[in-house]
């Protein structure tokens, strides 16, 4: 296997290489027993969330960032997702877009309250369904840019859209990337 199930860490206040200790069951693995390929990450600074996974999964796991150990079950996504884009503030984490093997690129945005476990809820929709999209956020907005789709026809997007994380609703178009990319 060229991928493993391990959590790699490096203290954020120090320079150096990650500690590649063998903590079991993680997030970025593929291969015969892969669970997490293209997961989406969110954090409130204390808790880190991992959403989605290989072949369109509904995984929703978390870790406590300040300690080592295995991930724990947080809940489930509403739909199975691979290669979505993650945004968060100190309260909410959301995943937008993505795909699963049986459907075209998704426009769905799902969210959770980071401090409490539970299943994801519907936030709204992206302006364009796509996967492999970039995502950034601050304390008020979550933005998704670019991305691609494969079904029914392949495309690459230059769309940039955003949501206000404090309230639910559909994303708004806020411009375009200089070129379409994923």
Question: Model regions: which residues?
Answer:
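Polar, enzyme-active/binding microenvironments
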Residues: 1-182
């Amino acid at each position: 296997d060229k991928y493993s199930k391990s959590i790699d860490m490096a203290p954020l206040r120090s320079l150096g290489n990650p500690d590649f200790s063998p903590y079991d069951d993680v997030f970025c693995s593929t291969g015969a027993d892969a669970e997490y390929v293209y997961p989406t990450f969110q954090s409130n600074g204390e808790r880190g969330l991992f959403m989605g996974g290989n072949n369109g999964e509904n995984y929703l796991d978390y870790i406590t960032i300040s300690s080592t150990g295995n991930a724990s079950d947080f809940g489930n996504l509403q739909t199975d997702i691979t290669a979505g884009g993650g945004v968060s503030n100190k309260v909410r984490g959301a995943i937008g877009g993505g795909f699963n093997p049986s459907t075209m690129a998704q426009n769905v945005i799902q969210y959770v309250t980071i401090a409490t476990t539970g299943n994801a809820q519907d936030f709204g929709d992206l302006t364009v369904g796509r996967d492999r999209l970039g995502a950034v956020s601050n304390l008020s907005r979550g933005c998704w840019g670019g991305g691609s789709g494969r079904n029914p026809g392949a495309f690459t997007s230059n769309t940039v859209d955003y949501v206000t994380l404090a309230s639910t609703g559909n994303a708004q178009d806020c411009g375009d990337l200089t070129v379409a990319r994923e």
